Regions:
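Hydrophobic alpha-helical and helix-loop surface patches within well-folded domains
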Residues: 1-149, 153-155
Length: 156
């Protein structure tokens, strides 16, 4: 599974990049949303109590939602900051164990954006938000009211 096209060999045209993005949405993002909307979903990050549990936690949530969240992060901080942050992370932590926060810190330094604060909500919680937008006009001005709730596939 590819999260992003090979960043050193970008697609040769806007059309190829668009094909890649479309393929990602149909193959990965939709699957992640479907599974993450179920009651038996789980966060991307899960504590492992025993090595025998490791295989159990790598499922479509881990891979598809994980890939979707990384794609969202890439779009949030931009390609240059993403590449710079990943290079810093891989260089600083090569041959070492790390925590998720180490990755967020490298990407935060490269981008100047609050990566840890934003991304922790996506990796430590199951599900995703459903945003409701209400539009009305008052005294000639358009007013938007946004509310959000956790989306559940069963409607509850």
């Amino acid at each position: 599974m590819r999260v992003l096209p090979n960043l050193s060999i970008m697609p040769s045209s806007d059309y190829d990049f668009l094909k890649f993005q479309t393929q990602f949405v149909s193959d990965t993002l939709i699957s992640a949303l479907e599974f993450d909307a179920l009651k038996n979903s789980h966060p991307i990050e899960i504590e492992v109590g025993h090595p025998s549990e490791v295989e159990e936690i790598f499922d479509s949530i881990s891979y598809n939602k994980g890939a979707s969240v990384i794609r969202m992060l890439h779009n949030y901080i931009g390609n240059d900051a993403f590449k710079q942050g990943m290079k810093h992370y891989l260089t600083k932590h090569s041959y070492k164990n790390t925590q998720t926060e180490d990755l967020w810190a490298s990407l935060e330094t490269a981008s100047g954006k609050p990566v840890g604060k934003v991304m922790t909500t996506w990796t430590s919680q199951m599900g995703f938000p459903l945003i409701h937008v209400e539009s009305r006009v008052e005294a000639g001005k358009k007013i938007l009211t946004l509310t959000q709730e956790k989306f559940n596939a069963d409607g509850r």
